[in-house]
């Protein structure tokens, strides 16, 4: 069971009350099927789903459009469970979209199945995107999502993304 409840604010010194992490709606961790109501109470504007559509359908027993389409704008960025994104540039582009939405005052919710592994990886990469060093990004993520950074493959992706991100910044 995910720690810190089914939904929690991702807290750091920027974008206060704008970034949330969550379990998948209607999935195995949302046993009361109440997560969507919690999202509504927070006035979430956008959802970033990190699950492939096939995983979402299998675990939530509904299509994403059936759950999100009526209430939320959403972005699907599929990452296989316990795996990593395939492309650094796609990740960088999505992080920039997230950054732009937050700069425009939008409330964003990010989730995978349990809201831990892929969600923690994504949010730690976002902190790098914002200019945090890797040690602070890991520390902030672990403070917010206690069981994050336990997957060696995702840990290596974070290290490699950090190098990619720094190389891009040197070229600009």
PLM regions and their residue ranges:
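Conserved SAM/SAH-binding loop-helix junction
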Residues: 118
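Cys-dependent protein tyrosine phosphatase-like superfamily
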Residues: 1-109, 121-172
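Conserved G/P- and acidic residue-centered "switch" motifs that form tight phosphate/ATP-binding loops
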Residues: 115
């Amino acid at each position: 069971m995910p720690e810190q409840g089914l939904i929690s604010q991702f807290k750091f010194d920027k974008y206060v009350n704008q970034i949330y992490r969550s379990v998948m709606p209607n999935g195995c961790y949302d046993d009361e099927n109440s997560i969507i109501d919690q999202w509504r109470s927070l006035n979430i504007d956008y959802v970033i789903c990190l699950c492939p559509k096939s995983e979402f359908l299998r675990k939530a027993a509904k299509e994403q459009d059936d759950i999100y389409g009526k209430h939320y704008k959403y972005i699907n960025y599929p990452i296989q469970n316990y795996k990593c994104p395939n492309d650094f540039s796609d990740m960088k582009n999505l992080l920039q979209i997230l950054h732009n939405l937050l700069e425009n005052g939008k409330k964003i919710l990010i989730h995978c199945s349990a809201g831990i592994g892929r969600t923690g990886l994504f949010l730690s990469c976002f902190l790098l995107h914002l200019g945090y060093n890797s040690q602070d990004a890991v520390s902030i993520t672990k403070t917010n999502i206690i069981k994050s950074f336990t997957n060696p493959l995702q840990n290596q992706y974070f290290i490699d993304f950090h190098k990619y991100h720094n190389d891009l910044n040197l070229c600009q």
